[in-house]
Amino acid sequence: MASLIYRQLLTNSYTVELSDEINTIGSEKSQNVTINPGPFAQTNYAPVVLESWEVNDSTTIEPVLDGPYQPTSFKPPSDYWILLNPTNQQVVLEGTNKTDIWVALLLVEPNVTNQSRQYTLFGETKQITVENNTNKWKFFEMFRSSVSAEFQHKRTLTSDTKLAGFLKHYNSVWTFHGETPHATTDYSSSTSNLSEVETTIHVEFYIIPRSQESKCVEYINTGLPPMQNTRNIVPVALSSRAVTYQRAQVNEDIIISKTSLWKEMQYNRDIIIRFKFNNSIVKLGGLGYKWSEISFKAANYQYNYLRDGEQVTAHTTCSVNGVNNFSYNGGPLPTHFSVSRYEVIKENSYVYVNYWDDSQAFRNMVYVRSLTANLNSVKCSGGNYNFQLPVGAWPVMSGGAVSLHFAGVTLSTKFTDFVSLNSLRFRFSLTVEDPPFSILRTRVSGLYGLPAFNPNSEHEYYEIARRFSLISLVPSNDDYQTPIMNSVTVRQDLERQLGDLREEFNSLSQEIAMTQLIDLALLPLDMFSMFSGIKSTIDAAKSMATKVMKKFKRSGLATSISELTRSLSNAASSVSRSSSIRSNISSISVWTDVSEQITGSSDSVRNISTQTSASRRLRLREITTQTEGMNFIDISAAVLKTKIDKSTHISPDTLPDIIETESSEKFIPKRAYRVLKDDEVMEADVDGKFFAYKVDTFEEVPFDVDKFVDLVTDSPVISAIIDFKTLKNLNDNYGITRSQALDLIRSDPRVLRDFINQNNPIIKNRIEQLILQCRL
């Protein structure tokens, strides 16, 4: 459980410098920037969610195959097939309205001679004669029309899929009969009181709407989809269909979860955003015919409005990004009218509106997730501006319009001039509208966009309305304020401490004995076996979870340790080094993608960037086809554990800080992987270099791309602990047998230990290089 929570935190929780994101958006003018905030992301490193708003409608999409459900008793709704999926139960279903219909389905296994069997139907013990001389299963449909009558065999379904069906429709009960794969359905028994028919189902079952009856017939005759036959499909109680979902209202506070100190509150709010543009008009010196620049400026606005009877005081700051620079030059003379630069916002521009109000939702906006908004669009039209020349008719700028469309919302630390509080930063994309703008008495006409001359026209403000929603982690005691840690001094002290810890951690590389390292790497490791020697594993997990929420950014090593946890979790209870020591994680799909990428074109494999990408992902394939050899993850984990054990300063509290910014490739950055076919080895490293050579002579041979693709798809991928260069050097200087070469190629830890015990300098040097690469 702890490792699951930790893995989720590593995967989802990181923080983002908002200012960097905004600068990037502005410089690249990108319209598709989406950052997953993760749970409890901090406001002072605000998460960014820029995505389309999904507006719920009343359309309900019914699943074709709903289930499986656990055995139960209930009144099935009319016009829904009950698809019965028994295992070896003798009584599959009982149904009655207690007036004129009693129906039961009995299951009889293949190859049963004529015999009398005892069944309990509707609380009564009955002797019923059954027979099944086929190799398929048989469903016997038994029926009676009164409580005093005896059950009669009505009809039979002979099935190799072992599936049966039951339906209430119109005024009849419907079932299947015949023999698969040609079984059919029609009504079995009529009743005047169909709605009161209650069923007791003794097997797992599915629910299929009658509108999808063709699929039900298909399942009866050919079987369930393969997905339904895996161990991952677990039946649930039918009551799960009756869960009542609380639909969030427009203005309300909902407690999502609560502990002794903290609670998650969902705030749903109506919102009215009023904003206006500001501009700066700078005139050049001289005779008064020339203007230097006319540009947009940030504009603050404060206003009040009613929200469900509550008076709300709101503040907004409007700014623009991605402006377009225009100019006009009427001539070279000092008396010729000209504007050196004037700004226009168009389709490639963005408008940002920071919003804050004094409601409860903004008082604890520190740890926030699930921030969404739904806003309408607004049209902004430009007005007239007169260029007052000393002599002559004045040029007049007029027209121009754009529409603002909601494109995303983030938490913002860019506060308004009125208050220094957390705010919401709404982002709007633009489309140009009619009329175009022009400058009267000049050549400028028919241009689209909103110029900075008079962007508000006659409007005091522009208004956008609708709603927003967020979930905030707040203290359980409403009198407490959520603490905000944004001290520069604290961050500098922390960086200094982390620097000292990294230096100590890296200096310990010289103290690791290689035989000890290999012995340790042979052990089955899971997430917390790396922290043996720490007094409390639980405390370590808690500390790491807390630190990760605060410190982990885009940590590659966080992902690496998460992968290590998944790939080694099954090994914690076994000392075997068999192929089962690695859980078959979701790497296969990742590698399949790589295989398709490589197979697509032989030329693309020869491209250096493609080679690098492929070789880095080779380790995913390696995990799913683990051999008896040692791999890079074993060494990484062993080095990490050894250094922690030797350290005098590293504790569970500081470990997440140390590795917060490290990446998995940096821990052992110079990796190499190989595949083996007969007497030929094909090797790839993360720098994009590929080798092919013979095992006996270490003579290089041409690298066959197609063969390599086939091998990495179908054969085990091995960590090249002793790489090709080291092997060739070892063979040239010492000479090694074919058997030793194969063992070294397979990274056999026993042979590695033998070479180290013999103080072989070439092998020792290679292992030392790997240890020294494990730096932070």
UniProtKB/Swiss-Prot annotation:
Belongs to the rotavirus VP4 family. A motif (YGL motif) lies at residues 448-450. Residues 484-516 form a coiled coil. Residues 65-224 are annotated as: Spike head. This is Outer capsid protein VP4. GO terms for biological process: permeabilization of host organelle membrane involved in viral entry into host cell; virion attachment to host cell. Keywords: Capsid protein, Coiled coil, Disulfide bond, Hemagglutinin, Host cell membrane, Host cytoplasm, Host cytoskeleton, Host endoplasmic reticulum, Host membrane, Host-virus interaction, Membrane, Outer capsid protein, Viral attachment to host cell, Viral penetration into host cytoplasm, Viral penetration via permeabilization of host membrane, Virion, Virus entry into host cell. InterPro entries: ConA-like_dom_sf, Rota_A_VP4, Rota_VP4_MID, Rota_VP4_MID_sf, VP4_concanavalin-like, VP4_helical. Pfam families: Rota_VP4_MID (PF17477), VP4_haemagglut (PF00426), VP4_helical (PF17478). Residues 389-409 are annotated as: Hydrophobic. The keyword Oxidoreductase does not apply. The record marks R231, N232, R241, A242, R247, A248 as: Cleavage. A motif (KID motif) lies at residues 643-645. GO terms for cellular component: host cell endoplasmic reticulum-Golgi intermediate compartment; host cell plasma membrane; host cell rough endoplasmic reticulum; host cytoskeleton; membrane; viral outer capsid.
